[in-house]
């Protein structure tokens, strides 16, 4: 059963927020709005700058922090920038700052051992650009066709990654079908079908919201939900 919760909170002028996306409410009830790649990348890492607005007033929500993993296909280009024993792939992400958890890649070869590293160029105040290591792995295959994964321990700050494979004295691997796995989460709130609503994000200096909805957080998270739809920015 949905808790008794006001569907509007304080008024808000969204001028300080960098981005907004329309939210489509298709059914009345408790809503679950999953953040898109653009929203989760554009919002603060703690989600404290997220605001739902309807007719100039905030819509109170709670955050469902259960991690959801989604997959995107990036734009990838092989390059011989280093030559020699290394193969280098440039990976273009769809948005800057996407919280990538790992890369997944296919290869037809069934017997190999390779060290792989993922890096990105970062601007350092007063020092120009430096290459930062975001993650790496040691790939092994001994006749099987297991998935090739590269976990990232540091999230990208930009939208360009560099994958380097150390081939040793072996022929390069025929890597293909690159996938980017990223983490996202959802907002839970009450709304009526057709409510005109927008999600605002991208305001690093604002305080996190404090809604009365926090008092019924467990009830909201446990309630039956319908999926709201987040449109492209």
Please give the residue ranges for each predicted region.
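Extended non-catalytic domains of envelope/secretory-pathway proteins
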Residues: 1-233
């Amino acid at each position: 059963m949905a808790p008794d919760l006001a569907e509007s909170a304080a008024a808000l002028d969204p001028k300080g927020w960098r981005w907004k996306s329309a939210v489509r409410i298709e059914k009345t009830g408790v809503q679950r709005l999953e953040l898109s790649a653009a929203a989760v990348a554009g919002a603060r890492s703690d989600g404290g700058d997220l605001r739902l607005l309807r007719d100039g007033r905030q819509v109170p929500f709670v955050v469902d922090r259960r991690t959801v993993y989604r997959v995107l296909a990036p734009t990838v280009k092989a390059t011989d920038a280093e030559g020699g024993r290394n193969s280098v792939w440039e990976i273009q992400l769809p948005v800057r700052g996407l919280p990538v958890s790992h890369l997944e890649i296919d290869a037809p070869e069934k017997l190999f051992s390779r060290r792989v590293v993922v890096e990105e160029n970062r601007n350092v105040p007063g020092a120009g650009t430096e290459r930062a290591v975001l993650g790496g792995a040691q790939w092994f295959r001994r006749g099987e066709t297991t998935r090739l994964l590269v976990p990232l321990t540091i999230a990208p700050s930009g939208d360009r990654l560099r994958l380097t494979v150390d081939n040793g004295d072996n022929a390069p691997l025929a890597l293909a079908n690159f996938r980017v796995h990223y983490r996202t989460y959802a907002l839970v709130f009450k709304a009526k079908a057709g409510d005109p609503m927008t999600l605002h994000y991208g305001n690093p200096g604002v305080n996190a919201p404090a809604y009365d909805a926090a008092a019924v957080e467990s009830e909201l998270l446990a309630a039956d939900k319908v999926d709201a739809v987040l449109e492209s920015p």
